[in-house]
């Protein structure tokens, strides 16, 4: 059932905060901990059980740590990739209770409590050197075998973790099609498909074809730098729903997870891949298969067609720096230079779900719209907010038996705040 408004309430700050700008906070994929990147050249690891600092990772980078990402599917240890303005990428490892992969949230929370002050146990395993200037974003693939990095040098690098016990990584691709600073990279939640956003105002999608990585789509629509992209969760489109809404969602699922983006143009947009089946239907019976050009010069079979599905309500007065798509509820959050935290919900347009004629197809096709359901003004006072992320709630205030989420915002004042959404 659609909500009319959402109540976004401050739960806690993560303490102690950094005394310098913080860029991004990455929730661990399985444990109630997060890693926060700071301009003071460190990464701080906090507990989401008691909101206290567990470790400070130092000594690996010579300039600001701009980005970090936890490697998924690791047993017995935690592995963190960091990207810095010193143009390098670091891989850090820690053999301890951080690495307990437990479905029992209580056990995981206790594990995070045990890992208190031994920051020296973080091992700087390897330095990945290749970029010519500031690294802006790092992202692990869903399998955990590939690491994507991007930088101000306009390039995207893909590294393979050889997982040979010697911390060896191999460069498998360097893509340089972007015409400006590459601000972000994000892997598809289930496939080896990479999305990137850039100062050139475009979003590009990349896949491997015959051992060669290349661009399969270039999404144009933003009128400014694309600061951040985030994928929809695979489970956001549930199967087995009844009625016309169920049919509509199953049809949309053919496109796979959608992509959200935000920009200097103050907008948040949603992009959808057009399924090949739909393209074939559109092209049937038209010259040259609907492309208007002979097949000999048509794009290759690996190319994909993406379309802008929605522009969300304009809620920001300044550039939007980050978006976060809840993999559990489908809610979308955005933050930016105006200090606002905004929450959006996708709904069926009034009446469209009841527009079915009993004897035939819908008189008005089902459609959805995005509605802003919550806003926090000045979430970090006068400071710009650089990042937002969803995480599983882990503190003692959560409702027993409920799988709650929290929002985590990271800002220029060095603070990281945790919010509940009801």
Curated annotation (Swiss-Prot):
One of its GO terms (cellular component) is cytosolic [4Fe-4S] assembly targeting complex. Essential component of the cytosolic iron-sulfur (Fe/S) protein assembly machinery. Required for the maturation of extramitochondrial Fe/S proteins. This is Probable cytosolic iron-sulfur protein assembly protein 1. SUPFAM superfamilies: WD40 repeat-like. PANTHER family: CYTOSOLIC IRON-SULFUR PROTEIN ASSEMBLY PROTEIN CIAO1-RELATED (PTHR19920:SF0), WD40 PROTEIN CIAO1 (PTHR19920). GO terms for biological process: iron-sulfur cluster assembly. WD repeats lie at residues 13-56, 60-102, 130-169, 177-220, 236-281, 315-354, 379-420. It comes from Aspergillus terreus (strain NIH 2624 / FGSC A1156). Belongs to the WD repeat CIA1 family. Keywords: Repeat, WD repeat. InterPro entries: CIAO1/Cia1, G-protein_beta_WD-40_rep, WD40/YVTN_repeat-like_dom_sf, WD40_repeat_dom_sf, WD40_rpt. It holds the Pfam family WD40.
């Amino acid at each position: 059932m659609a909500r009319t408004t959402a109540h976004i309430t401050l739960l806690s700050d993560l303490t102690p905060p950094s005394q310098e700008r913080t860029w991004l906070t990455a929730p661990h994929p399985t444990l109630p901990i997060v890693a926060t990147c700071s301009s003071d050249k460190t990464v701080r690891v906090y507990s989401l059980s008691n909101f206290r600092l567990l470790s400070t990772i130092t000594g690996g980078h010579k300039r600001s740590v701009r980005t970090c990402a936890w490697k998924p599917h690791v047993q017995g240890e935690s592995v963190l990739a960091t990207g810095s303005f010193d143009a390098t990428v670091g891989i850090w490892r820690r053999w301890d209770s951080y690495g307990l992969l437990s479905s029992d949230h209580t056990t995981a929370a206790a594990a995070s409590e045990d890992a208190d002050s031994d920051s020296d146990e973080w091992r700087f395993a390897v330095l990945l050197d290749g970029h010519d200037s500031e690294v802006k974003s790092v992202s692990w693939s869903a399998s955990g075998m590939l690491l994507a990095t991007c930088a101000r040098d306009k390039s995207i690098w893909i590294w393979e973790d050889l997982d040979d016990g010697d911390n060896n990584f191999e460069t498998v691709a360097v893509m340089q099609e972007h015409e400006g600073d590459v601000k972000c990279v994000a892997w598809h939640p289930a496939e080896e498909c990479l999305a990137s956003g850039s100062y050139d105002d475009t979003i590009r999608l990349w896949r491997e074809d015959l051992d060669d990585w290349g661009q399969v789509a270039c999404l144009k629509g933003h009128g400014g730098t694309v600061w951040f992209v985030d994928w929809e969760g695979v489970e956001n489109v549930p199967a087995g729903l009844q009625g016309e809404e169920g049919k509509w969602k199953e049809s949309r699922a053919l496109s796979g997870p959608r992509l959200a983006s935000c920009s200097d143009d103050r907008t948040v947009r949603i992009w959808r891949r057009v399924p090949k089946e739909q393209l074939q239907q559109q092209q049937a019976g038209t010259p040259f298969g609907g492309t208007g050009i002979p097949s000999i010069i048509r794009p290759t079979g690996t190319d994909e067609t993406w379309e802008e599905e929605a522009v969300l309500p304009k809620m920001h007065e300044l550039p939007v720096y980050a978006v976060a798509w809840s993999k559990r509820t489908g809610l979308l959050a955005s933050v930016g230079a105006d200090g606002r935290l905004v929450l959006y919900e996708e709904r069926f347009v009034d009446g469209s779900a009841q527009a079915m004629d009993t004897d035939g197809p819908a008189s008005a096709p089902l459609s959805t719209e995005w509605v802003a359901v919550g806003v926090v003004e000045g979430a970090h006072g006068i400071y710009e907010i650089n990042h937002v992320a969803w995480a599983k709630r882990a503190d003692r205030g959560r409702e027993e038996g409920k799988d709650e989420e929290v929002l985590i915002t990271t800002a220029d004042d060095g603070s990281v705040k945790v919010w509940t959404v009801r």
